[in-house]
Each structure stands twice: as C-alpha cells, then as structure tokens.
Design a protein with these regions (language model features):
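Conserved anion-binding
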Residues: 1-46
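A signal for specific C-terminal beta-sheet/loop modules enriched in small/flexible residues
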Residues: 30, 37, 131-143
C-alpha cells in the first residue's frame, strides 16, 4: 500500500483496497477464479519498512492462514551501505543476500523468492537449514514435518 506502509495498510489492500483501489485484492482474485493464494508481503528497502513487511508475515498467517513470503533478497541489493562495503569486502554480499531469505523463513514465511537462479546453490542449503531449525522448534507443540521435508532428507 503506497499510501499506508504499515501492517494495517498492507492488510487493508488485501481486504478492502484501503482507499487506494475500489476493492480488496482478495476479492479481485476471487472474481478471477483464483482460490489458492500466495501472499507476498511486499518488502521495501531497509529504512523504508523492511521490518514492517516481515511483521506483516505474522499478521497474514494469523488472520487468514494463507501461504506468505516475499522477494526479501531484494533488500540487500537496495542497501546503499552494503553496495559500498562490498567493493572492499566481496564476501559480505552473499551472506546478506542469502541471509535475508532466512529472515523471511523465521518470520513464518512459506516461500522466499531467493533471486537469480545462480543463487540456488547458496540459498537452498541455507533455507533447508532454517526449515530444519523451524521443524525442531515446532516439534514439542505437535507439529511434524512432511515426508519430503529437509529434516528427513538431509539429516
């Protein structure tokens, strides 16, 4: 929501259009025959609401239970300080790029748009590790990983 970049503003766009469009995006999607939603929380750069987008992940899951995620890997590429820093410290870039995906996962995200396909070799093991952490954390509350979960494939 360009008019209200808060959690409430993001929810409002989906619910009723939040005064920026005539109806909510969920209603529009339903009218188009879409009934399986992937909720992208629209991450903005650091200093412009990136944290709000992550917090919106919890709100979306709590309110609707729909799968939620984002292209959070765009945050490091929009970070001016990191662009300068990586000129002398190239090793910092992939850590922040791949690490950003873990933030979305640990905030309850169901998917991450991890960036160009070249990132897959770094992103997949890191994201699998985060999935295993989450699986272990949820075990004592009765949540079991699905059969093809990294917990079973990689341990």
């Amino acid at each position: 929501n360009p008019m209200d970049p808060t959690v409430e503003g993001k929810i409002g766009i989906w619910e009723d259009g939040a005064g920026t469009i005539d109806k909510g995006l969920l209603e529009m999607a339903a009218e188009c025959g879409i009934d399986k939603y992937l909720m992208d929380v629209a991450v903005t750069p650091l200093g412009q609401g990136a944290g709000v987008a992550v917090r919106t992940s919890f709100a979306v899951k709590s309110k609707w239970g729909y799968p939620v995620g984002s292209g959070i890997h765009n945050v490091p590429s929009a970070w001016d300080w990191l662009r300068e820093y990586k000129k002398d410290h190239k090793e910092a870039w992939p850590v922040c790029d791949v690490g950003s995906n873990l933030i979305q996962q640990m905030a309850g995200g169901d998917f991450v748009l991890y960036g160009p396909i070249e990132n897959a070799k770094m992103a997949f093991p890191a994201c699998a590790m985060a999935d295993i952490f989450i699986s272990e954390a949820a075990k004592d509350i009765g949540t079991e990983p699905v059969e093809d979960h990294p917990f079973f494939k990689l341990l």
